[in-house]
């Protein structure tokens, strides 16, 4: 069998490979606890980007082909897994960034729950008077609305990963239809990129520049944000959006 993982090049063109190390070459965990927080911020940010981008790619492909053969019934699970896990990574990147920038020593509990992570992040933003980075919490509106919808169905964090747990089944196992509006979900993620991710990317920039957040600097940073518009005549528009903004 041909090897999948390679340590060097071969005769194939470079675009025949995915380089796992490409975004992580300078981010090997150091021994210093403080340094680890900085590295964690970058790594969570990058990993979150990759999962969110994957959700967008799958959704865009399904919508462009009008959900041919109803493939969304299968693909909705990796779409949701990538969305929730990517968002989890973004939230953890935000928490790590703030604790690093302000040398905060509080230990937050390990969790996968979006609601708990959001609560921890809001607490940190209030503690250091930097709520403006997330538009005075308006950037959390999308996350809060998603969490509220999931709570209506008593959804577990692993609902898109496993269809059952212990002696129970997930909420969608049964006779009643549980439908997902694919277009609304796509727009939800796009908006999430232009709100929450934009704020997080400013925190990452602060770490990279070794400065603490500043409201005027943040306003200038936001003025340069992109604005993706779905244009069916421009085949590269979506790929450019993914490359530059996700």
Feature map (PLM): residue ranges:
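Domain-scale activation on soluble regions of proteins
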Residues: 1-246
